Amino acid sequence: MVLVDTGVWIDFLAGRSTPEVSLVVSLLEEKETISYTGQILQELMQGCSDENDAKTIEVHFEPFIELFPQRSSYRLAAKIYRDCRKQGYTIRSSVDCLIAACAIENNCQVHHKDRDFKFIEKVCGLKILRK
């Protein structure tokens, strides 16, 4: 299962041609199981200019698996943040720590374009999709 992060979805939905978008297209064509968190959906929907665009995004995400943070996810997210900080990496968004925690707990690879996930991988063993 692959968790696709917000930045990649933004480029995908905008029709941009990037290596990350090409990989999402391949994942969809290969019928790979794709997941997301509510935080990712929220970030995408809050960037919409109107309710119709937000609803369109919701509909696009219906076939994917939503990962729900558990109590343990929040604890792990806090630990991820602390562990990264101890190693000299300040994660810019605690949301990224929560997304990483959900991915770790659900044994997902993360497909991203955000440097914070590289730091989390280095310190905490987050699985990053590479193809």
List each model region and its residues.
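Acidic, PIN/NYN-like endoribonuclease modules and their adjacent C-terminal/linker elements
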Residues: 1, 100, 104-131
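Short, well-structured N-terminal submotif of metal-dependent ribonuclease cores
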Residues: 1-36, 46-59
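Histidine- and aromatic-rich ligand-binding microenvironments
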Residues: 5, 37, 92-93, 114, ...
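Generic structural signal for small/hydrophobic residues in well-ordered secondary structure
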Residues: 5-6, 44, 77, 103
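A generic structural signal for short hydrophobic patches within well-formed alpha-helices
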Residues: 9-10, 41-44, 117
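A general structural signal for well-ordered alpha-helical segments in protein cores
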Residues: 21, 37, 41, 54-57, ...
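Short, hinge-like loop/turn segments at secondary-structure boundaries
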Residues: 51-55, 84-85, 127-131
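Active-site neighborhoods of divalent-metal-dependent phosphate/nucleic-acid chemistry enzymes
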Residues: 66-111
